[in-house]
Amino acid sequence: MNLFCSLTTISYLCTITNIIHPMTKKLLLGLTALLTATTMSAQPKLRADNIDEVLKAMTLEEKAKLLVGGANNFFSTGAVVGGEAKLVPGAAGTTAEIARLGIPATVLTDGPAGVRIDPIRKGSNQTYYATAFPIGSCLASTWNTDLVAKVGEAIGKETKEYRCDVILGPGMNLHRNPLCGRNFEYYSEDPLLTGKIAAAYIHGVQSQGAGVSAKHFAVNSQETLRTSVDERVSQRAARELYLRGFEIAVRESNPWTIMASYNQVNGTYSMGNHDLLTSILRDDWGYKGMVMTDWIGIREGLTTASEVHAGNDLMEPGQPAQVNEIVAAVKNGTLDIADVDRNVRRMLEYIVKTPSFHKYPASNKPDFAAHAAITRQSATEGIVLLKNNGALPWKDNSIKTVALFGENSYDFLSGGTGSGCVHPPYVVDMVKGLQNAGINSSKTLSEIYTKYIDFAKVKFQAERHPAKWYQMEMFGQQKYPEIGISPICINNEVKTADAAIVTIGRQAGEGVDRDIATEFNLIPEEQALIKDVCNAFHAAGKPVIVIINSGSVIETASWSGYPDAILCAWQPGEEGGNSIADLLTGKVNPSAKLTMTWPIAATDHPSTQNFPGNIDFYSFQEAKGNKAALPGYDYTNHDEDIYVGYRYFDSFNKNVAYPFGYGLSYTTFEYSKPAVKVNGDLITVNITIKNTGKVAGKEIAQVYVAAPAGNIEKPSHELKGFAKTRELKPGESETLTIQMQKRDLASFDEANSQWMTEAGQYAFQIGASSRDIRATVNAKLTEYTEKVSNVLAPKHKLNILTASKK
């Protein structure tokens, strides 16, 4: 009889006091105390060096409990933002505590643009705001991994100071299509840039003793029906594009955790996809960390036992029924206890790294001033100058008063919606940003727009459009429709203002994709506003600047000819207005570059034909008798295959509004002395950058590689490396060194399930964008191959786009 059984028996005997002699009762109680003390002393307490001992001491029920989240408050339909209340109000979730073995609960908080927790708590006079850092698209546009790491460090510090252990980010899905509602959280259409920026972010966070959860693994390319849609993709496109960024991050930064996505990949849910979570992630890449589900609980068509077997270590947000299911599956033989033990070991290895395990004394008082400075710097370096006809920068106090048009000049969008939104202590809008730079703005326009915004907020609350109210009001800032401004009003502003700014805002986020007519394109009121303001101010010889305050790409080709300058400010965090003013006044020279192609029209992307919103749901279902699977909703075919973003536009010679890697500066740069050296598998590219202009600035050198014709069709060229100079003074030069491995140039050979770099002459193109190549050097490479798991093949035929279909 074990100690637990002995204690249970003695406790039972002690309850039947009517039949036990008093002396016997005292003896039994003493024995109970002795056995309790013995049992407690025999139980191991978790340490970093006794994980196997603790695992052996755990009961099956405790093991199952540790694999299931803390069952926090969340909407029963799943697929929403979590709502932890017990430890850190507003955090997304927790892991289970097992006190007898010294296993603490850990706290998971949403991100990745800052710590997402409730700013107000019942019974507390303190506020718990968090710094709103620039969104992913803005951060990546810096192309500055050192700066991104600093942002990560600040986020890691706030994560710890608010008693959290893991921030649920970075978001690493590709910008397959500009209509995806969650693109603002993600970095790029290119996997190399995605992986490098993510690795820097992860290094920064984890250097502070907090963890990350790189998400959403994998092929989460749309928000529409994201919890069920089947993303059908070739093995090659999956390996080269949708998985490659994760692979880079895993190999270079070793994230504590990875979050499996809601969607299916080739017919199997990612959360229960052994091909993804074990064969590729662990066997091919060597990942040793913990994998968690996205927030959904029990779902139809996927058992918790199958998730455990596939390699999912933590089911979030957690439901008691999932614990019971794991226990039952082990007992009835449908789940191997070895799978459970393997996952529990990974959970324990994660827990011993956390601030909660180390009893970190959280202050609830982050260094907001220091983090605001980092936010301002990273936003300023991530804002892209798209056009400049000599209107910027404003010099010598030439601009004293500005007419600010557009409702988002006054209701500035610092970030997106959903789990990616943050509750900051403040947001610097355009009015405040200009004021801090010593520039006045129109009081008349301020009164018009602030009164309109107050009205629009009341109207929005009254109407409560179901999808948008949930998305915006509960989990982010609403974007209100633009209003018309009369020509009389505009002409009155011309009389008193030295320049005009028109801010065009767009909001998007979790759970909803964007439409073309009103969210990608400008609505008629916005088109008219830009045209009327430009005509009026230009007639008086005064400049007009357009500020794009959007997390995602918008249409520009139809109106970009009107303004004198265009700045893509993205959603740059709480310091946005200050960052924009720094650029307008020339305090900082723009150095950002686009991380995605800006097409002339949304339909120019080949993926748009297989993207939700391009299909009339009701007409399709009626024609098919409500029985057929709906393309773009029930499934999405990645027929464009490897031709995503610039890989398509450059290979097929399609016109674009702004190419990948594009961004202007107030100075000019010369590229010289290009060189490439091959030493075994290591390839080193050198380029010297000289500032040939009149002001200091930074430049980003991008290395694209064009492969020789071979057995595997490839895009015309692909980004394989990049580097950013320090700030160069006029006339100053810097030689950049960019290294890559021969494997980095490989394509995925599906027939042989291997990576292959074919032998031949490779062109290393060094440029300022994918369409502005400044120097080219060639090198001959020998063949390279690497076998990997033959998994993740599509179950349905895809109509793959090839060069022969140009």
Regions found by a protein language model. Give the residues of each.
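Bacterial Sec-dependent N-terminal signal peptides
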Residues: 1-45
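Small side chains
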Residues: 30, 499-500, 779
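Glycoside hydrolase catalytic-domain context in secreted enzymes
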Residues: 42-747, 756-766, 770, 792, ...
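Extracellular/periplasmic metallocenter environments
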Residues: 753
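Short beta-strand elements
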Residues: 772-788
